[in-house]
C-alpha cells in the first residue's frame, strides 16, 4: 500500500487547512478521488497548474490515488512557455484555478476545476507516477519521470529521519510544484498529518499570523528563505509551537547554518540541513541536528535506504577521506529518467537506482559529505534550479540578432550580452516575465563580444573577467 492510497485509520484526520478558513479531511480526499475515478481513467495524463491551495493539493493526491499521472506546472510560469509544455506532452486533462479556463468543467473541487484538454493521453510506462519540471520556470520541455516507488520510498525516508508523526503541522512555505515543497506534502500525508496551506509568503504579516493561529510545527526553506528570515528577525519571533526547521534547495552559507543551528539548539528546536535533486524525487541526504554545529557546511549523510560514493573521472570510487570527485547516489528514490516529449513517457527505468549528481563532493573522516562545486551548468535561484544554457536559449530565441552567455553562482546569475547598455533594462524585464526570476538575483551586462574558441564555443571561464 502506498501513502496516497486509502488508509481507514486516517479518514477522520484533517488533511489540509487553509488561510480562508477551509479544511479538508482524508475522507474528503478519498471521496473526491472516487468521484474523479468516474471521469478520468487510470493511466491517463493530467496537467495541474499548481498553487498552495486545498484544490490544487487535492488535485495532486486524487491523481496519485486514481493512478492518473500528474504533470505539475508552476502557476506563475509564462503562458507562452506553459502552452509549449502542454503541446509537447498532450495531457488529456488539466486541473486549474477557478476562472482561468473557458467552458464548463468536468468536475470541481474546492478552488479548482478539471477540464478535458485532449481527446486521449499519450502512452505511459506502467510504473510512471509523476512528472516534474527540472528548471523552475524556464519552460524547458525536459521533465523528470518518477515512479510510484520513487515517491513512496522518499516520503518514507524523510518521515523516518525527521521523526514525523500525525501530530505535525507544517506550513506551505514552498510551492507544491517544486520537488522540495511537494516532498513536505508527501512525507506528512504518509504519517496522517495535516498541512497548513497559504498563498502568503514569509514577507507577509499574514503568513506569520497564520502560523500562530494554526499552531504550525515546522517550516521548510531554501537558502534565500533563510536569508529572508534573518532579515525579518525570525529568531526573535514568538512561535511556541514551531519545533522543526528544514533547509534544502542549494548550499546554505556557513554563517546562516551556524546562526540557525545555534538558535535551534538554544530553544529546543531542530534545524536540519539537507541535500537533494528532483532526479532523486527530492532528498538524498540530511545533517542530523546533533551534528549541525559540529559539521558546518556539510550536507550530512545519505538518507535511510540510500548511499553515496565519490567517483573519479573514470567512475572509479575514491575511498580516501577528503578526495574530491563526482557525488554518486544509489537508492530507491532515484527517478526513472528524463522525458523530452510525450513519446518518452512510455520509457522504462533508465537509471536503475543510480544517479550521477553532477556535483563535486568529498567525504570527511567521519563519513560526512560536503559539496565542493558543480560539474554541470546550473545554479539555484531562490531555491529553483535554473539551467544557464536554457536561459541563454530563451534570450537567443527572442533576440536573434544579439549574443548571450550566462555564468555565476547561486542567487547570482550573470547574463552577458552584446546588446547595448540601453537595452539591458528591457532584457531584465524579459527574464523576469519569462523565467519568473527576481531582479535581485541576476545581473545583465553589456559587452562588445562574447569570447569564443576556434570552434565557436563560448569560453565561459573568460566571462567573469570581461570589462564593460
Question: What do the PLM-derived regions correspond to, one by one?
Answer:
Residues 8-12, 115-133, 140, 163-169:
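Conserved pre-ATP/AMP-binding loop-to-beta segment of ANL
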Residues 307-330, 365-366, 424:
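Conserved beta-loop-beta connector loops within the AMP-binding
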Residues 23-26, 128-156:
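Conserved AMP-binding A3 loop
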Residues 379, 407, 414, 429-468:
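Conserved C-terminal "lid"/linker of ANL adenylate-forming enzymes
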Residues 35-76, 173-174, 385:
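Conserved AMP-binding/adenylate-forming
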Residues 322, 326-389, 397:
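Conserved ATP-binding/catalytic segment of the ANL
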Residues 152-169, 179-218, 303:
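Conserved AMP-binding/adenylation subdomain of ANL enzymes
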Residues 216-221, 230-294, 307:
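Gly/Ser/Thr-rich phosphate-binding loop
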Amino acid at each position: 500500500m502506498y501513502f496516497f492510497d486509502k488508509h481507514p485509520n486516517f479518514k477522520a484526520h484533517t488533511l489540509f487547512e487553509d488561510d480562508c478558513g477551509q479544511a479538508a479531511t482524508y475522507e474528503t480526499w478519498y471521496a473526491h478521488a472516487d468521484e474523479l475515478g468516474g471521469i478520468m481513467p487510470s493511466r491517463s495524463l493530467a496537467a495541474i497548474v499548481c498553487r498552495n491551495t486545498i484544490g490544487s493539493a487535492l488535485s495532486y493526491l486524487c491523481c496519485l490515488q486514481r493512478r492518473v499521472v500528474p504533470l505539475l506546472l508552476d502557476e506563475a510560469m509564462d503562458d507562452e512557455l506553459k502552452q509549449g509544455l502542454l503541446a509537447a506532452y498532450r495531457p488529456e486533462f488539466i486541473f486549474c484555478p477557478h476562472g482561468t479556463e473557458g467552458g464548463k468543467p468536468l468536475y470541481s473541487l474546492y478552488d479548482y476545476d478539471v477540464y478535458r484538454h485532449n481527446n486521449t493521453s499519450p502512452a505511459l510506462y506502467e510504473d510512471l507516477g509523476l512528472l516534474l519540471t527540472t528548471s523552475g520556470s524556464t519552460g524547458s520541455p525536459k521533465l523528470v519521470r518518477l515512479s510510484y516507488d520513487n515517491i513512496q520510498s522518499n516520503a518514507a525516508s524523510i518521515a523516518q529521519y525527521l521523526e514525523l508523526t500525525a501530530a505535525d503541522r507544517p506550513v506551505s512555505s514552498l510551492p507544491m510544484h517544486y520537488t522540495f515543497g511537494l516532498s513536505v506534502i508527501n512525507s506528512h500525508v504518509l504519517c496522517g498529518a495535516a498541512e497548513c496551506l497559504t498563498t502568503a509568503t514569509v514577507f507577509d504579516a499574514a503568513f506569520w499570523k497564520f502560523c500562530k493561529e494554526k499552531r504550525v510545527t515546522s517550516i521548510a526553506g531554501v537558502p534565500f528563505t533563510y536569508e529572508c528570515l534573518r532579515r525579518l528577525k525570525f529568531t526573535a519571533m514568538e512561535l511556541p509551537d514551531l519545533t522543526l526547521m528544514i533547509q534544502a534547495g542549494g548550499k546554505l552559507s556557513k554563517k546562516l547554518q551556524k546562526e540557525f543551528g545555534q538558535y535551534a539548539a538554544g530553544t529546543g528546536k531542530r534545524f536540519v540541513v539537507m541535500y537533494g535533486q528532483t532526479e532523486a524525487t527530492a532528498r538524498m541526504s540530511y545533517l542530523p541536528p546533533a551534528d549541525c554545529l559540529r559539521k558546518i557546511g556539510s550536507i550530512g549523510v545519505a538518507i535511510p535506504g540510500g548511499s553515496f560514493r565519490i567517483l573519479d573521472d573514470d567512475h572509479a570510487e575514491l575511498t580516501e577521506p577528503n578526495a574530491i570527485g563526482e557525488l554518486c547516489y544509489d537508492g530507491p528514490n532515484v527517478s526513472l529518467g528524463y522525458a523530452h516529449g510525450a513519446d518518452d513517457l512510455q520509457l522504462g527505468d533508465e537509471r536503475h537506482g543510480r544517479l550521477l549528481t553532477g556535483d563535486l563532493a568529498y567525504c570527511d573522516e567521519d563519513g560526512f559529505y560536503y559539496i565542493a562545486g558543480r560539474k554541470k551548468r546550473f545554479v539555484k535561484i531562490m531555491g529553483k534550479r535554473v539551467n544557464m544554457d536554457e536561459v541563454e536559449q530563451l534570450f537567443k530565441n527572442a533576440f536573434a540578432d544579439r549574443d548571450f552567455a550566462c555564468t555565476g553562482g547561486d542567487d547570482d546569475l550573470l547574463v552577458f550580452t552584446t546588446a547595448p547598455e540601453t537595452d539591458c533594462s528591457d532584457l531584465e524585464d524579459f527574464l523576469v516575465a519569462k523565467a519568473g526570476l527576481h531582479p535581485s538575483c541576476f545581473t545583465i551586462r553589456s559587452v562588445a563580444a562574447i569570447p569564443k574558441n576556434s570552434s565557436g564555443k563560448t569560453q565561459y571561464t573568460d566571462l567573469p573577467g570581461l570589462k564593460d
